């Protein structure tokens, strides 16, 4: 609980993302005993932390945000070296991360996360109804796995950690091996904020090393898992959690190709513009966004041919970029090779992939691959590449979309004249994705109350939640009901006097009124 430990003997080195050379930062792989100590520290902190008022927890989150804001230019330079991300992107991501913490602080002060429901007793009814009162409490210690592509917003102090801490759950972070020094700086900021706010020891913990995640997920003190990463990694954690003597939920955001459908009237009116905008979305951040449009669909026509040609030109004109690390580049190259080897797929545009940087690529696949259930097109290629598919008619387009797996997002690019003809695609896409876009691009994910960053498997392991936005807190809460409890023993959210001033559901009616 806040104590540093380096009992292991395996030294881990942070690497320069551009050169692959070791940076002057060394870390030690956590031992099994250290993983146990971290989980136990979180377990000890949980009873005290969850009983703190929402206002106290809100102050803690705001203190973390302020500490992140205070990290200087040296921190930005460090993140830049570990990830190859440009300074402006890092600064923007830091602001996003801090504001996300502040947004959850607002949620705590607002109080609706309590989900207060009261059905007052009716002793004169036959049979009598007991007095029943429900609210929600934190699940317990949460293991969080940092993501490679967002070293701040989806990592140590990112959305999963913010949501768990807001819910009253201590956190144990498994630092991502691609930005360990960044993780250490952020962890220090969190620990300083915890001390400033008077939080219990063990409210935040972090461990390093490959393989330690397995021990963390299996640990009996851990009550839930938050993960952002590959389908392989997320599925492995889900299987581990399900095999525990006491299974726990895993909220994993894993794989999505984010289909984008370009409708005929949009092609006719602004096909080249859409091609330029789409190329910008595909290559944003070197294509290392889980919301990158990885599959583009349209109806066979001269207009679609012209659009595909313009998209190829736009992608070919964009420069190669450095990826997050050598492993990410290697995975990108392997993904391109799988596409190139497939007889039903051909490369349309892009420089030959060579060297230390990733070149944008455009491929075209036969629609029959989707119709026949070929799994290759369902696999995300993490990097600046996308695949186009043309359907013969509306019926074939709908069938192709219907054969897609679950997605984080699905996009329609169209005009008013397209809406009547293609409105039937909307209920189909509603079954496939967590966020539907019209005339926009999915790479931007706003942090707000209404956002859903989730979707059916394999986009996530649980389609009922989101990892971005204030609804994310609900993943780490569970309902608790009190029957015929005396008012003095009830939490403030359920007391008759309603001291928190909450909007509560009382006997089927929403009200802020105190009860008699």
Regions found by a protein language model. Give the residues of each.
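Rossmann-like NAD(P) dinucleotide-binding subdomain of oxidoreductase/dehydrogenase enzymes
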Residues: 112-275, 279, 301-304, 514
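Residue-level signal for inorganic ion chemistry
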Residues: 20, 57, 79, 168, ...
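N-terminal Rossmann-like NAD(P)+-binding subdomain of aldehyde/semialdehyde dehydrogenases
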Residues: 1-130
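Conserved C-terminal structural/oligomerization subdomain of aldehyde/semialdehyde dehydrogenase
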Residues: 21-24, 198-201, 222, 296-297, ...
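ALDH superfamily catalytic-core signature
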Residues: 189-193, 232-372, 399
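Structural signal for hydrophobic packing residues in well-ordered secondary-structure cores
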Residues: 46, 50, 65-72, 76-79, ...
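Short, flexible turn/loop "capping" segments at secondary-structure junctions
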Residues: 14-19, 252-255, 286-291, 375-381, ...
């Amino acid at each position: 609980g806040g104590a540093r430990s380096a009992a292991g003997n395996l030294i881990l080195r942070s690497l320069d993302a551009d050169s692959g050379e070791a940076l002057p930062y060394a870390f030690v792989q956590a031992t099994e005993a250290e993983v146990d100590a971290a989980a136990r520290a979180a377990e000890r902190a949980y009873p005290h932390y969850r009983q703190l008022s929402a206002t106290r927890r809100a102050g803690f989150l705001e203190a973390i945000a302020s500490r992140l804001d205070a990290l200087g230019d040296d921190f930005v330079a460090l993140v830049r070296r570990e990830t190859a991300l440009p300074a402006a992107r890092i600064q923007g991501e830091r602001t996003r991360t801090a504001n996300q913490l502040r947004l959850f602080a607002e949620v705590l002060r607002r109080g609706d996360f309590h989900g207060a429901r009261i059905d007052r007793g009716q002793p004169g009814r036959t049979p009598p109804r007991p007095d029943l009162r429900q609210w929600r409490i934190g699940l317990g210690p949460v293991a969080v796995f940092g993501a490679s592509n967002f070293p701040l917003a989806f990592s140590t102090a990112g959305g999963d950690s913010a949501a768990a801490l807001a819910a009253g759950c201590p956190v144990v972070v498994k630092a991502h091996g691609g930005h360990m020094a960044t993780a250490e700086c952020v962890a220090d900021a969190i620990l300083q904020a915890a001390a400033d706010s008077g939080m219990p020891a063990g409210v935040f913990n972090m461990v390093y090393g490959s393989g330690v995640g397995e021990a963390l997920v299996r640990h009996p003190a851990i009550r839930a898992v938050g993960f952002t990463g590959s389908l392989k990694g997320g599925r492995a954690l889900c299987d581990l959690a399900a095999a525990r003597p006491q299974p726990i939920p895993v909220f994993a955001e894993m794989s999505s190709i984010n289909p984008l459908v370009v409708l005929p009237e949009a092609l006719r009116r602004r096909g080249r513009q859409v091609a330029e905008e789409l190329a910008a979305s595909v290559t944003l951040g070197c294509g290392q966004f889980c919301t990158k449009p990885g599959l583009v669909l349209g109806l066979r026509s001269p207009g679609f041919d012209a659009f595909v040609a313009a998209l190829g030109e736009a992608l070919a004109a964009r420069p190669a970029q450095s990826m997050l690390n050598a492993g990410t580049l290697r995975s990108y190259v392997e993904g391109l090779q799988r596409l190139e080897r497939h007889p039903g797929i051909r490369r349309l545009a892009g420089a030959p992939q060579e060297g230390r940087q990733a070149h944008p690529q455009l491929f075209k696949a036969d629609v029959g691959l989707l119709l026949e259930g070929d799994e290759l097109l369902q696999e995300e290629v993490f990097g600046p590449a996308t695949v186009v598919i043309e359907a013969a008619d509306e019926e074939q387009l709908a069938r192709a979309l219907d054969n897609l797996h679950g997605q984080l997002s699905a996009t329609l690019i169209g005009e008013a004249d397209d809406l009547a003809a293609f409105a039937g695609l909307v209920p189909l896409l509603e079954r496939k994705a967590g966020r539907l876009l019209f005339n926009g691009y999915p790479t931007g994910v706003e942090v707000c109350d209404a956002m859903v960053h989730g979707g059916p498997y394999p986009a996530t392991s649980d389609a009922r939640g989101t990892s971005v936005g204030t609804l994310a807190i609900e993943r780490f809460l569970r309902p608790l009901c009190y029957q015929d409890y005396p008012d003095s023993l009830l939490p403030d959210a359920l007391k008759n006097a309603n001291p928190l001033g909450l909007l509560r559901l009382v006997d089927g009616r929403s009200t802020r009124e105190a009860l008699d």
